[in-house]
Curated annotation (Swiss-Prot):
One of its GO terms (molecular function) is sequence-specific mRNA binding. The gene is pum. Changing R1127A: Disrupts RNA-binding. Residues 1234-1238 are annotated as: Non-specific-nucleotide binding in RNA target. InterPro entries: ARM-like, ARM-type_fold, PUM-HD, Pumilio_RNA-bd, Pumilio_RNA-bd_rpt. This is Maternal protein pumilio. Residues 207-237, 256-276, 863-875, 1496-1519 have a biased composition (Low complexity). Changing N1368S: Abolishes interaction with brat.
């Protein structure tokens, strides 16, 4: 047993009350020795945990004797049981020192997150052994009592659980009220059964094994006696206490229903006769299956009825999922979809209509033994069935849960057994199962002890178990396990292989990343746990009939826990303000703002029935009448499962009403309810609670069985709703009526829209719940969560009717996958596995057919993708509320409050209202003629806020085009009519380029508005504007700030309000208020951006395609500073007339300097220097004077200076240049100024630039090595006179060796070699000689060496080449392989004369084969081949004497080798034909001497693969010339 992160430390930790509610005595008698024995057992079993670290409130260990007609409970029996208790006490005492606290604040690190998951405090393995079944004479020491959060509250009627009359201590807020005496009896009965089962196990372990085997063989036996006894137990009434949430105080007298623990005790007596060793079922039923606080929910049915009470930490009961359709006998208990994270309104849950009349007896019996303690992190492994059992869709019978060894063994409690790494006994389900598993069961983190976490070695052991056998072997026990393991995920973090292989798609919600998932307050994503997908086959869009055919036990999803009353969060209310609304005085408040609605059973029977499922919304200040208390960090909130947002009815209730509350609290000018925040919250709580109660009655779907009877129940429930309205407060009657009507539609839609694809396929009953909610935004209803039923689909195939009187599918929305539009307008969809919706901001209300919001037949319309449907119960999830359709377009409503996330533009805070795109805002303001001043101002403010918040058109044509926003032409599909209004003439930007940037402007406008002397009557208007401008998603700190508004539209609407107010004989006050609102609205939305005129805006938006320069009068400067405007002026100036140029010039002259430094304006100035008249050029030149240095150092001004130097007169050039005197070096080293200096040297007379030469004295080397200065030096060497360049060159020669190797200086040396005098070149070449090899290998110097070889004289070049060739072969070989020097060798080959070329070829030839191995050596070979191909002819045919072709020619052509090169060199005396075949593609080497004779160079050492044949023909008469094709240069082409 462990209390790791459970509820031993919660909000407001008080004393620890340890109650040992032993049922002792006979008919009320209390045995002292029994009390002592029970207290000792409890202290040993539980107390040691808390005794090590008691809470400040002290520890109360009470023994409460409870009598009063508890059947089957007697006094303490034999001393054998007492001895056993003592033995267990000693056993647990030994482990006391090994136990440490697992609280989060004691300094101990919790490395295993699973340790924080709550485990049932009543672990049967730790329970003291009880006696055999009591018959009034022999009992046993009671099991461990409940552990309260605070100290027990003593006194009252009988012993209390967590204290009691005999042992209560402390008064600081235990969880158990003094009126829980009856609950103690029930609890004790259950504990007695657990202790008795443990005792049986101690006595007969062998019998237990035999019984377990028998249970495997007979998993579905149900004894008639047990059934009869269960029914009798249900009919026996015993007072039970109704456990609350909040502070744990009871909120009403218990409803006299016998606790299931007593039923279990009676069942156990029968089971002992037939299955004496079967203790697992008792233990699990006691510990996990049924919680004692839910006993009041048993009236009118068996213990498998829907429990409306608190069945889980932070839960309010649950919303049972709809049963799969099928015959009555095929169904079993249904799965509960618990709405976690909420407070509980547990009053009268017993009036819930029974849900078990359609269950077969075997399912009931098996479910009684069921304790499906499964979590999303621990899927069950199912052994192959032995073929015995009831028939199911799985061949061979159902698969039994894997029996984990070590469970139930007393020795395995405190030591690590085979499957556990945690120091507690892990509960597992019993071998029997009431259904056949076609896949993994629906699970949730219920927080009980059955935890298999992937973070410990358990999973590894499970894997070993799985792979110990071969699933492919037919004889193996694992052969049936493989298809089930494929569908299991041991943790939410585990991704299937398909998820890894496929990319995330917006249509697949499983593509969500972990860090993208918003965790709700209950720890699940969007209110839906990932493992509660809507099919059991990942990747499939439809659930398989074989997997969904069998129902599941009621405790499968969230097995109710013992002591769940301990799990309620402190401070959570139980019913809003209902204690004073419908309570009868017996209700006890359970938290701040929460009142119990218990009351007398007879007086409020119907009330209790309807309020049993009340689920107060989890929103701020609405459902509970207070902010929801912070969830305890020690509570595993993932165990809460899906919250109540899954229910369509509750989704409707909480969001709609919460939005109204939001508007009332934030928009006081628009409020229609009480101004007192507390009163509004109380009214909201009452109305919401009442409406929720009325709606929740119709929420539970009908289980398998008679659908006609379900129809009758629905009618009865509707009658109860009508009766319920009579009990409601006056403030909530109107809302309740609309809420009831909406819930009727929601209930019908929930039944009608089950996920039925084919008639032969079972339905997934909870597809209607896929519209979950995001995590609340500071406790406010989620926004942008549109349920999938907003798109009623048509044209589906007829389905089987759900009821005999139900209509066909033509009136039923065919919902399969919800579609969404994101904030960009893209259509997105949510997958059917989890149904996670997309967050979006509605661009337009087009997802609902036009006729969906009207009662009766719709008006005649053209063909549409989604035809309008009649207003039926199956029409939509959201029906008429507050006179408007929440999900539709409330075009004729005057309500100013509504859902933020609806498509109702007149009520939505996040969708454009009706007044946004149409002129109805003016009409709405005009309707305020007969209203008060505040109302008129509020209407004007609303219109202004709407206009200022959303872009739109104000013209009547645009309004008529869109009418009432889709009443006639808005399509429900993106394929239909446009979903956004056409761009108006006043706006082109439909959205803000910087969302949130306009908040500052809005704030300034509000400050200006506050500064205006408004009369007192305009306070409401001012407050409304402020509230509308600073709503939640439009605040100054929000990124979802309002987009840019349309100019003038808000002011028009407010002005209309002013006119209307003036007509109402309240001219002074109202007109002033409306005028102020109009001014504020106009300032917010109508003011253009500073520096951009309307003309420029229209031009930028291409509204003036034929704009001319003359049309830009008084806008030239503005256009020049704009990118598009500047380009327009530049293009026009090239062909402009003189008058147009003068008009432009006159405007830019005043702002010439600012335009010179402008990023776009400088181009206009340059154009004038280029295409302007001489006078204009000179005038602009005069504007440059006095600013030359500043402009020269400026990025854009330097361009203007350069253009001016090219265009102005020489006199002005000199004037401009002389302004740089004294700043030459500064400009030369500047990234912008160096360009100006270079332009000066290029354009200005060199005589006028002597100051630049003078400034360079002594700075040549430093400037030559400067990235910018080296450029200026080169310009000087190009354009200056010899007298000016001589001192520069002299300094260069002094630093030649350094400059050659400098990254910038080498450019200066190269420039001298290219453009300098010959004497200067010779000086540089001589400095290179003797260093060719070294400098050629330098990155920068190699460039200089190349220039030396290129620009040297013949003698100097010969000297450089000879230096390389005559040195040694190694030098040339190194240069050819070097990455830099190889370029020098190539340059030598290019420019060398034949004598040098001969030397080079002689040196290179031996290394040609080796050069092919080097990247840079290949360049040499390529250069040689390319060079010699120019002087060779591959197809020359030589002729001998008498015109006979030379035989060698044919031989050369036919000597096919890898490559053949035929070279013909003609001289005056003979023709030489050389044919060389080389498999390595070696070229033929032919040297042509200067005297014209040809010399064939034979390979010095030809390779073995080379063959050469050279034939010299006889003498030929040179005067005849060659015979054949025309020759060119004595070479045959």
């Amino acid at each position: 047993m462990k209390f790791l992160g459970g509820n031993d430390d919660r909000n407001g930790r008080g004393g620890v009350g340890v109650g040992t509610d032993a049922i002792v005595g006979s008919r009320g008698g209390v045995s002292q020795d029994a009390a002592d024995a029970a207290g000792a057992a409890a202290a040993a079993a539980v107390g040691y945990v808390f005794q090590q670290r008691p809470s400040p409130g002290g520890v109360g260990v009470g023994v409460g004797g409870v009598g009063g007609g508890v059947p089957g409970v007697g006094a303490v029996g034999s001393t054998l049981h007492e001895a056993a208790a003592a033995e267990y006490a000693a056993h647990f005492a030994q482990k006391q020192q090994q136990t440490r606290w697992a609280c989060g604040d004691d300094g101990h690190g919790i490395d295993n997150p699973d340790k924080w998951k709550y485990n049932p405090p009543m672990n049967p393995a730790n329970a003291a052994p009880g006696g055999p079944p009591g018959n009034g004479s022999n009992g046993g020491p009671g099991a461990i009592g409940t552990i309260g959060m605070g100290s027990g509250l003593g006194g009252g009627g009988g012993g209390g659980a967590g204290g009691g009359n005999n042992g209560g201590s402390g008064t600081n807020g235990g969880l158990h009220h003094q009126s829980m005496a009856a609950a103690a009896a029930n609890m004790a009965a259950m504990q007695q059964a657990a202790a008795l089962a443990k005792h049986n196990h101690m006595i007969s372990q062998a019998a237990a094994a035999v019984a377990a085997q028998q249970q495997h063989q007979h998993p579905h036996q149900q004894h008639p006696q047990q059934q009869q006894q269960q029914q009798q137990a249900q009919n026996q009434g015993h007072p039970h206490h109704l456990m609350g949430g909040g502070n744990g105080l009871g909120n009403g007298n218990g409803l006299g229903i016998q606790h299931p623990g007593q039923q279990q005790q009676q069942q156990q007596q029968q089971q002992q006769q037939q299955h004496p060793g079967q203790y697992n079922a008792n233990l699990l039923n006691h510990a996990a299956a049924l919680g004692h606080m839910s006993s009041y929910a048993q009236s009118g049915g068996s213990m498998y009825d829907h429990h409306g009470g608190a069945m889980h930490p932070g839960m309010n009961g649950g919303m049972p999922k709809q049963q799969p359709l099928g015959p009555p006998g095929a169904g079993g208990p249904q799965d509960y979809v618990y709405m976690g994270g909420q407070t509980t309104v547990p009053m009268g849950a017993a009036m819930m209509p029974p849900q078990n009349q359609y269950m077969n007896s075997s399912a009931v019996a098996a479910a009684n033994r069921n304790a499906a303690i499964t979590t999303s992190t621990a899927k069950k492994l199912w052994e192959k069935s032995d073929g015995k059992g009831v028939s199911s869709s799985t061949p061979g019978g159902p698969l039994h849960p894997l029996q984990i060894p070590g469970i139930g063994d007393p020795s395995s409690v405190w030591k690590d057994h085979t499957w556990s790494t945690q120091g507690e006994n892990i509960l597992v389900p019993p071998p029997s199962r009431a259904y056949a598993h076609g896949g993994a069961s629906d699970t949730s983190n219920s927080g009980n002890a059955g935890i298999l976490s992937p973070r410990d070695s358990t999973c590894a052991k499970v894997v070993e178990y799985v792979f110990s056998g071969s699933p492919t072997n037919k004889d193996s026990s694992l052969s049936g396990l493989e298809p089930h393991l494929r569908n299991l995920k041991f943790d939410d973090n585990d991704k299937s292989r398909d998820d890894k292989e496929k990319a995330n798609s917006p249509f697949d919600t499983n593509g969500l990343k972990k860090d993208d998932q918003v965790t709700n307050s209950n720890g699940v994503v969007n209110g839906i746990d990932d493992d509660k997908g809507f099919n059991r086959t990942p990747g499939s869009r439809q659930p398989s009939p074989a997997e969904e055919s069998q129902p599941r036990p009621p405790n499968l999803l969230f097995p109710p826990l013992p002591f769940n009353h301990m799990l309620m969060d402190h401070g959570q209310g139980m019913g809003g303000g209902l204690g004073g609304v419908v309570g009868s005085g017996n209700g006890v408040g359970g938290g701040s703002g929460g009142g119990g609605a218990g009351g007398a059973y007879a007086a409020h029977q119907q009330m209790a029935a309807q309020m049993s499922q009340l689920q107060p919304p989890m929103m701020n200040g609405v459902g509970g009448g207070m902010p929801m208390a912070a969830q305890s960090p020690m509570l595993n909130h993932q165990a809460a499962g899906p919250n109540h947002m899954e229910s369509p009815g509750n989704l409707l209730q909480q969001q709609n009403f919460d939005v109204q509350q939001l508007f009332r609290s934030q928009n006081p000018g628009l409020a229609a309810v009480a101004t007192n925040a507390a009163a509004a919250a109380a009214a909201a709580a009452a109305a919401t609670s009442a409406a929720s109660a009325a709606a929740a009655v119709g929420a539970p779907p009908v289980p398998n069985g008679s659908l006609q009877q379900s129809q009758q129940q629905q009618q009865q429930q509707q009658q109860q709703q009508q009766q319920q309205q009579m009990h409601m407060a006056a403030a909530s009657q109107q809302f309740l009526a609309a809420q009831q009507q909406a819930q009727n539609a929601a209930y019908a839609a929930q039944q009608a829209t089950s996920y039925v694809i084919n008639p032969g396929q079972e339905a997934a009953p909870y597809m209607g719940m896929i519209a979950a909610a995001q995590m609340p935004y500071y406790g406010v209803a989620p926004w942008g969560m549109y349920p999938g039923n907003l798109i009623p689909q048509q044209g589906t195939q007829p389905r089987r009717p759900l009821t005999p009187s139900q209509q066909g599918a033509e009136n039923q929305p065919y919902q399969v996958i919800p579609a969404f539009l994101d904030h960009t307008g893209s259509l997105l969809m949510g997958g059917p596995r989890t149904g996670t919706p997309m967050r979006l901001v509605s661009p337009a209300p087009v997802l609902v057919p036009p006729g969906a919001t009207r009662a009766g037949p719709p008006p005649p319309q053209g063909p549409q993708l989604y035809q309008p449907q009649p207003q039926t119960a199956q029409q939509n999830l959201y029906s008429q509320q507050n006179g408007s359709s929440v999900g539709g377009l409330a075009l004729n409503t005057s309500s100013l409050t509504g859902r933020r996330d609806s498509f109702d533009r007149s009520t939505s805070a996040f969708s454009p209202s009706t007044m946004d795109y149409t002129s109805s805002g003016v009409a709405a303001a005009a309707n305020a003629v007969n209203s008060t001043v505040a109302q008129a101002a509020a209407a004007a403010a609303a219109a202004a806020a709407a206009r200022g918040k959303w872009p739109g058109a104000m013209s009547g044509a645009a309004s008529g085009a869109y009418g009432a926003l889709g009443a006639g032409n808005a399509s429900a599909s993106p394929l239909g009519a446009p979903i956004t209004p056409p761009p108006s003439a006043q706006s082109c930007l439909l959205g803000s380029r910087a969302p949130g940037a306009e908040s500052r402007q809005r704030q300034q406008q509000q400050q200006q508005l506050a500064a205006v002397g408004l009369p007192a009557t305009a306070a409401a208007a001012q407050a409304a504007v402020a509230a509308a401008a600073n709503n939640m998603f439009g605040s100054n700190s929000s990124i979802f700030s309002n987009p840019l508004a349309i100019p003038g539209t808000a002011a028009v609407a407010a002005a209309a309000a002013a006119a209307a107010a003036a007509n109402s004989r309240q001219v002074a006050a109202t007109a002033a208020a409306a005028a102020a609102v109009a001014a504020a609205a106009g300032g917010v939305g109508g003011a253009p951006q500073p520096g951009r005129s309307r003309l420029l805006e229209d031009f930028r938006n291409q509204r003036y395609p034929n704009l001319q320069l003359r049309d830009l009068a008084n806008h030239i400067v503005e256009f020049s500073q704009d990118q598009h405007g500047s380009r327009f002026i530049q293009q026009k100036l090239e062909r402009a007339t003189a008058a147009e140029k003068q008009m432009v010039f006159s405007e830019i002259l005043a702002a010439a300097y600012s335009l010179m430094t402008d990023v776009f304006g400088n181009y206009v100035i340059q154009k004038f220097f280029e295409f302007g008249t001489p006078e204009q050029k000179n005038t602009l030149g005069m504007q440059v004077k006095g600013h030359v240095l500043q402009l020269a150092l400026q990025m854009y001004g330097c361009r203007v200076i350069q253009k001016a130097l090219e265009s102005i007169s020489p006199e002005q050039q000199q004037e401009i240049v002389h302004e740089l005197d004294g700043h030459v070096l500064k400009c030369v080293k500047d990234q912008n100024g160096n360009h100006v200096v270079q332009k000066c040297i290029e354009c200005v007379d060199p005589v006028a630039l002597q100051f630049i030469i003078n400034a360079f004295k002594g700075q040549v080397y430093s400037l030559s090595t400067h990235p910018y200065g080296c450029r200026v030096i080169q310009r000087i060497l190009e354009h200056c006179t010899a007298e000016q360049t001589t001192p520069i060159l002299d300094e260069l020669h002094e630093h030649t060796e350094q400059l050659i190797q400098d990254q910038y200086g080498n450019y200066v040396i190269q420039h001298v070699l290219e453009h300098g005098k010959q004497e200067d070149k010779s000086i540089l070449i001589n400095s290179v000689r003797g260093k060719v090899l070294v400098l050629s290998q330098h990155k920068f110097a190699s460039n200089v060496v190349e220039k030396c070889v290129t620009h040297a004289t013949r003698g100097e070049r010969t000297g450089l080449i000879d230096e390389v060739c005559t040195f040694n072969d190694n030098a040339l070989h190194v240069m050819m392989k070097d990455q830099y020097a190889n370029y020098v060798v190539q340059k030598m080959i290019d420019v060398s004369e034949p004598t040098q070329l001969k030397k080079l070829m002689t040196k290179i030839r031996p290394h040609m084969a080796a050069l092919r191995k080097y990247t840079y050596g290949k360049h040499i070979n390529a250069k040689l081949e390319k060079y010699y191909m120019k002087i060779t002819n591959p197809i020359t045919v030589g002729t001998g004497a008498g015109g006979v072709p030379a035989a060698s020619s044919a031989a050369a052509v036919s000597s096919g080798a890898t490559s053949a090169s035929v070279t013909a060199c003609t001289s005056g005396s003979s023709t030489t034909t050389t044919s060389t075949t080389n498999s390595l593609a070696s070229p033929t080497i032919c040297s042509v001497q200067e005297n014209g004779s040809a010399m064939v160079v034979e390979p010095s050492s030809p390779d073995a693969s080379e063959s050469s044949s050279s034939v010299v023909s006889g003498a030929v008469n040179s005067s005849l010339g060659p015979i054949g094709p025309p020759t060119n240069g004595n070479v045959v082409l």
